[in-house]
Amino acid sequence: MLKGINAFIRLIRWPNLVFIFLTQVLFEFTVIVPAFNEAGKPPNLSGGYIYLLALSSVLIAAGGNIINDYFDINIDLVNKPGKVIISKYIHRHWAILWHIVLSLCGVLLGIFIELRTHAYLLGLTNLACVVLLFIYSIVLKRKPLSGNIVIALLTAWTVLVVTFAETNVLFAEGSVLPISKITRLTFLYAGFAFILALVREVIKDMEDVNGDSRYGCRTFPILFGLNAARIFVAVWLVVLLALLAIMTIYVLQFGWWLSALYCTVLLILPSIKLFKKLFKSNDGKDFHAMSSLVKWIMLAGILTMLFLVLHI
C-alpha cells in the first residue's frame, strides 16, 4: 500500500506540482492583490478562488505527467530503468484512469471558477492545456523543438493564467486598473519561466538521447547533434543572463541592495555555472545534474516575488 502511494507521488512529479502551486499563489498575493488594492477593487479570485485555480493547474499537470510516462515506458526502460513506475508499481490501466480523472477534475474545477468569478474562458483554456499535454505525449515530444516549445509555453502559462483569470472580466466591464504594472510583471515572470523551461527541456533531451534514438524519436539533439543542442541552449542562457543583468542594474537604481544581491547570488551565478557545465558535460549523469540545477534556478526565480512585497 505504502509503496503504491509513494510510486504515485513520484509518478505525478510532486516537486513540479509544488512549483506550480507556489508560483500562482505568490504571484496573486505579490502582484495582483496589491494592484487591485491600489485601484480600490477586490481581486476577482478573492475568497480562496486563487487556491482553486492553483489546484486546477496542479491536477492538469499531474494528469499530463502520468500520460507522458504512460507513452514513454519503453524509452524510460533504456534511459532510466530504475525510475520506471507504470507497469512496475502501477498498472497501465490504472495510469490511464488516473490521467482521465485528474485531467477531468482540473477542467471541471476551471469551469466552476469561471462560473463563480466570471473568469471568462478559464474552463476552455484548462481543456486546451489537457489536450496539448496529451498531443505532446504521443507526438510532439518526439519531434525537434515543437514539444520543447509547447512545454515552455505551458510553463509560462502558469503565470499568465493568473493575470488572465483576474483581469479579463475587468476588461469586459471596462474597469480601470494599473494594468501596465501587472502586464510588466506578468511578462517578466512568464518570460523567465519560458526560457528556463525551454532550456531544461532541451537538456533533458540531451540526457535521453540513447533511449529516444532507439525508439525513433527525432528530438533536437538526435537530429542536429549534441553540439548544436549545446549552442541552442547557450544562446538562450545568454539571453537569460542579459535580462537578469539588466534587472539587477535596474533595481540597484532604487537602492534595493538585498534584491540585487539575491539576484546575483541565486540567479546570475548559478546561470553562469550552468553555462560553463554545458560545454563540459558529455553523459546522461552530467546532463541530469544540469537539469536539476535549472530547477533550483526556477525556484530561486519564483521566490523573487517575495521582494515585490518589500519594494512595490
Where are these regions (language model features)?
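C-terminal membrane-associated helical module and adjoining short loops/tails
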Residues: 1-19, 138, 156-159, 169-312
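Intramembrane alpha-helical segments
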Residues: 2, 9-10, 83-173
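Alpha-helical transmembrane segments and their lipid-water interface positions
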Residues: 17-23, 64, 68, 76, ...
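Membrane-embedded alpha-helical segments that form the functional core of polytopic membrane enzymes
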Residues: 21-71, 106-107, 120-134, 178-203
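Membrane-interfacial alpha-helical segments at the cytosolic side of multi-pass membrane proteins
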Residues: 22-31, 103-111, 158-161, 240-245, ...
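Residue-level recognition of pore/gate-forming positions within transmembrane alpha-helices
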Residues: 24-25, 57, 100-104, 130-133, ...
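Peri-membrane helix termini and adjoining interfacial loops of integral membrane proteins
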Residues: 35-36, 73-80, 167-172
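Multi-pass membrane catalytic core of lipid/isoprenoid biosynthesis enzymes
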Residues: 54-55, 73-126, 216-254
